[in-house]
Each structure stands twice: as structure tokens, then as C-alpha cells.
Amino acid sequence: MKYLFSIIILLSMGWTTDSSFIFSEKTKLDPCPNSPNCVSTQETRKRKRMRPILFTESSDLAIEKLERMLASKSRVTLVEKKGNYLHYEFKTKIGKFIDDVEFLFDEETKQIHFRSASRKGYGDFGKNKRRMKKIRKEYEK
């Protein structure tokens, strides 16, 4: 009976788990929506595109550096860390709106790609772009 139960558990784990997803690294961020409240380094539309953050150390050290930098900021929460990918929530001071900021570290090109987008509303008065310029400047100094 124990043997049968073990087999059922193992089979159900196989049906609910996609191991290729678990062990693969993210290589691309989602595109920005048509609304003006999003910027990304991988965006094809010029008005939404920003240049990536550059790093010289290994991607592991670059991830640690960015994590330390963002940990010192208020209203910033790490939501997910998976391989070369980080996802943060930034809560705005006024209105307590949440913006999603994602980082993707490319070891080969020594670039940190990012996407910063407001969860709600249509416009952001340029907040996402200003935030990412500030983060890039602080990281690269």
C-alpha cells in the first residue's frame, strides 16, 4: 500500500510540475501595454524604450549589488527572485499605487534589462521613466 501511495504521489508531481520551467532562466521581459505608464529596455517602441543598466562584475555580483541598493529604499518589496530575474513592487508615496519593476541580468552582454510598469491607471506622469533613470544612475556610479 505504501508503494502504491508513493507512486501516486510521484506521478501527480510529474503532472503538476513543468521541470523545464523550473530550471530554465528567463530571457525576455513582457512587452509594455499601449498605455503610457510603462518603460522597458526590450521595448521596440521608441517612446517606451530605455537603455539597459551596464555592469562589469559577474551577474551574481550584479544581482547582489542591485538587491542591496533596492533593500535600502522605502516602499520597495522583492516579490520574486529566480536565477537571473528579479521582480519588485514599488509603492508610490501618493495614492499608494503599486508599480511592478522587473530586472533581467544578461551575463553575456553585461546588461541589466528592466521593465517598469504601473499596475493601475493609464498614465504615470513619467514616474516609471524617472525611477529607472535614477536607479540606473545610482547603480552605474
State what each model feature region is.
Residues 4-13:
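Sec-dependent N-terminal signal peptides
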